[in-house]
Amino acid sequence: MSSKVTSQHAEELSTGARTLGVNLTGTQHELLLGYLALLIKWNQAYNLTAVRDPDEMVSRHLLDSLSVMSFIENGRWLDVGSGGGMPGIPLAILYPDSQVTCLDSNGKKTRFLTQVKLELKLDNLQVIHSRVEAFQPAQPFNGIISRAFSSMENFTNWTRHLGDADTRWLAMKGVHPADELVALPADFKLDSEHALAVPGCQGQRHLLILRRTA
């Protein structure tokens, strides 16, 4: 198990991104590896992610985040319960013309995210330390995304005030959450759903895209 970023990690990222159809620039590749280095370093002292082995982080964090990038459009994005920064940090790196907000209620995690912003010079990234229910932005977001955050019922109920009829809600899930879809609030509908294949990851991955009906 490596304690730092290696050439193997760099190659795995390049190959995996190509497999996903994501064309990384040299700068984006470098920034993603810089983010990985910070994640490995800080995870030794803070519990940023349950994935302790750095050799698993490229597939389970970076490539998993990149797998949804083709569904992203430029705009104002919110990553709810961002934790260690997935998928918000990769989103900010791949979409430099978008404004990305990473929100988490855990102070250790938002301190890490702030350090990532400073060290990688991600001027399009905002880090907010708050409970999602208490967060009151000046205007609605174009997109709200979560990865392993909560049930879809909670995700939509807790973020309803952060979007409007034009907002897309993206829920990154493992096994298809058919039971959670049944429990969606009445003013939300499933817009589309997509099975994802993430290089190096075992198990199912799904992306569900929701919209408000009112």
From Swiss-Prot:
Q: Name one GO cellular component term.
A: cytosol
| Subcellular localization(s) per the UniProt record | Cytoplasm
Under Enzyme Commission nomenclature, its number is 2.1.1.170
**Positions bound to S-adenosyl-L-methionine:** G81, M86, V132, E133, R147
Q: Which InterPro entries match?
A: rRNA_ssu_MeTfrase_G, SAM-dependent_MTases_sf
Reaction(s) the record says it catalyses: guanosine(527) in 16S rRNA + S-adenosyl-L-methionine = N(7)-methylguanosine(527) in 16S rRNA + S-adenosyl-L-homocysteine
Q: Which UniProt keywords apply?
A: Cytoplasm, Methyltransferase, rRNA processing, S-adenosyl-L-methionine, Transferase
Q: Which residues form a coiled coil?
A: none
- GO molecular function term, any single one: rRNA (guanine-N7-)-methyltransferase activity
Q: Which family does it belong to?
A: Belongs to the methyltransferase superfamily. RNA methyltransferase RsmG family.
Briefly, what is this protein's role? Specifically methylates the N7 position of guanine in position 527 of 16S rRNA.
Q: What is this protein called?
A: Ribosomal RNA small subunit methyltransferase G
What species was this sequence derived from? Answer: Pseudomonas fluorescens (strain Pf0-1)
